[in-house]
Every structure is written in C-alpha cells, then in structure tokens.
C-alpha cells in the first residue's frame, strides 16, 4: 500500500452547522491525517475556477452559489491509499445512495448540500491541493 496525499473540502452547508470537528474526526478515525488545513470564504471567481470541469453542467450556477455562500475548510489529507479511503469515508455524492456511517449519509442535506468534496484521482488531488496550498503550508 502506498502513502498518498489527497484534497478534502468541508463545504459551507456543513461549516454553517458546525460540523467541521465531527467530519474531521470521521476522516481521522479512518486513518487519514490532516497535514494542512485552512478556513476560506471562496469568491464566486474562485468557485468557478475550482469547479471549471463542471462549467457546462446544468448544476454549475447552483454549485458556484453554494460554494461561495459561506466558509469552507480546505484540507490536505495523508495516509495509506488516501484518495480511495477519503472517497469511501465521504460516501456517494447523493446521500440517499451513501452507505450507513459515511459522512454524506450522516451529515448531508441533499445531493447539492452534501457536506464534503474530495479528489477523485492522484492527478486531481495534485491540482486541487496546488489550487489552495503552497508547499510551505503542507506540514507532513
């Protein structure tokens, strides 16, 4: 097994409900270690750029609005197979489809307000980490 780094985000719908600690605990209990973390309030421009891959999708405007509606916690996680493990702990995008005990099953309000975002591949993780963090901010 390989030690990897991945990007994780606690979305505004979760920070508004003071779930930062509970969600981080679920990630840490799964063996992931937070090696960088900061609280940001994403501008509309940042949200558009970060989620540019979804620009042509019907939900893009709603996503940008949600992501710029309040504070977000951006994190770098490290651990064995961190990318897959983070996605497993997050659960399916639609909380109705998520397995019991996952972040989205426990905390999500809807498919849009689903509490968390996580990288889906090593390449995406690298890009998303670099979007929010400089190398000196990541302390492994």
Curated annotation (Swiss-Prot):
GO terms for cellular component: cytoplasm. Pfam families: NDK. It is found in: Cytoplasm. Its main location: cytoplasm. One of its GO terms (molecular function) is nucleoside diphosphate kinase activity. Its EC number is 2.7.4.6. The active site is at residue 117. ATP binds at residues 11, 59, 87, 93, 104, 114. It catalyses: a 2'-deoxyribonucleoside 5'-diphosphate + ATP = a 2'-deoxyribonucleoside 5'-triphosphate + ADP; a ribonucleoside 5'-diphosphate + ATP = a ribonucleoside 5'-triphosphate + ADP. It comes from the Bacteria. Belongs to the NDK family. HAMAP family: NDP_kinase. Major role in the synthesis of nucleoside triphosphates other than ATP. The ATP gamma phosphate is transferred to the NDP beta phosphate via a ping-pong mechanism, using a phosphorylated active-site intermediate. This is Nucleoside diphosphate kinase.
